[in-house]
Structures are given as C-alpha cells and as structure tokens.
UniProtKB/Swiss-Prot annotation:
Record keyword Hydrolase present: yes
SUPFAM superfamilies reported in the protein's UniProt record: Phosphoglycerate mutase-like
Entry protein name: Lipopolysaccharide core heptose(II)-phosphate phosphatase
GO biological process: lipopolysaccharide metabolic process
UniProt keyword list: Hydrolase, Periplasm, Signal
Residues making up the signal peptide according to the UniProt record: 1-25
Organism whose genome encodes this protein: Escherichia coli O9:H4 (strain HS)
Pathway: Bacterial outer membrane biogenesis; lipopolysaccharide metabolism
Length: 200
C-alpha cells in the first residue's frame, strides 16, 4: 500500500512537472510568433542573425502628418513631431545592437524624414524603387546587397510594400503600423523573409 502511494505521488509529481514544461513551451511559442504567423525577431535575435549573414530590415515610415491630429514636423506630406521621437527611439535601440548598416529610403518626405531621425546623422541614400512595390522590390534589394555584400541594410518604405512581401514570401497577412518592420536576407541570389522585427 505504501509503495502504491509513493508511486502515485511520484506520478503526480511528474505530471505536474510536465504541465509546467508545457506551459513554459506555450509561452515561448507565443513570444516567438506573431498572430499573423510571422516569426518575431527582437533586437538581440536580430544581432545574432546579423552575425550569421548580413540582414536587410525594411521599416514602414513613422506617423504621417496628413493622417494625424498631432503636430507636424514641417511639410504636411511628412511625419509628425511624435513620429520623429518614435523614429529616434527606434534608431537608438536598433543601433545599440546593429551599429553598422547602410541606410536607404523611398523618395517621399515621410520616409526620408523617418530615416533621418532614425539614423541620427548616418548617410542616407534615396531610392525611388522602394515606393511602388511588387516583385521588383526583390531585384532592388539584391542590387543593394550585391554592391556591399557584407553590410547590413535598413530601408524605410511603405505599408503596402511590407504587406506584399509578407504575403508573397510566407502567405502571411501583415498590416504594419508605423515603424513596424520585416527582417530579410539574401542568400545565393534569393531573398528570404526571416520574420517580423519587434523592438524590445
């Protein structure tokens, strides 16, 4: 009888441990994947990826002035003062882990301003190919990467570009908010989507 009780208690103990492990695994899965099905890549994970191969991070621009009641920075087609603060905060966090990158933006005021505030003085190259997005965006990314194959790349673009890439590469429905981003890389001439960038 005593042996049975000990066996029963032992079984319950193992069961509780298994439940705890399952709960932890569930939390890890929740943290690792977005609700849209894209892997979540935080700053530290991005830094580890960048050690394996150069990364390409595409961000949507900051809060646009013409769709907000917040104070405009300057031009109504640009971003808000809040947008500049958000872009600078994101840039500081990003640069702490990925200090070396080439910076690009599409040829709109809002993306140029976002990239400028994000980078805090880094040289910016404006490239109109990141305004109208479709399959050609991959050629543009590969072109930039081929010019500096060992450099990380940051591109400020638009929500429709990010939505297109997520759907095309992973069949994911991605509706990016301001300054949301996607992480990609180029390998053997092909562009791969690694996941959604999460700033924390």
């Amino acid at each position: 009888m005593l042996a049975f009780c000990r066996s029963s208690l032992k079984s319950k103990k193992y069961f509780i441990i298994l439940l705890a492990l399952a709960a932890i695994a569930g939390l890890g899965t929740h943290a690792a994947w977005s609700s849209n099905g894209l892997p979540r890549i935080d700053n530290k994970t991005l830094a580890r990826l960048a050690q394996q191969h150069p990364v390409v991070v595409l961000f949507r621009h900051a809060e646009r002035c013409d769709r907000s009641t917040n104070q405009c920075l300057s031009d109504i087609t640009g971003i808000t003062v809040k947008g500049t603060q958000d872009a600078r905060e994101l840039g500081n966090a990003f640069s702490a882990d990925i200090p070396d990158f080439d910076l690009y933006s599409s040829n709109t005021v809002r993306t140029i301003q976002s990239a400028t505030w994000f980078s805090a003085g880094k040289k910016l190259t404006v490239d109109k190919r990141f305004l109208q997005c479709g399959n050609d965006i991959y050629s543009a990314i590969k072109d930039l990467q081929s010019k500096a194959p060992d450099k990380n790349i940051v591109i400020f673009t638009h929500n429709h570009c990010l939505t297109y890439i997520a759907k095309d590469k992973r069949d994911a429905t991605f509706k990016p908010d301001y300054l949301n981003g996607l992480v990609m890389h180029v390998e053997k001439g092909k562009v791969y989507l690694d996941g959604e960038f999460v700033n924390h």
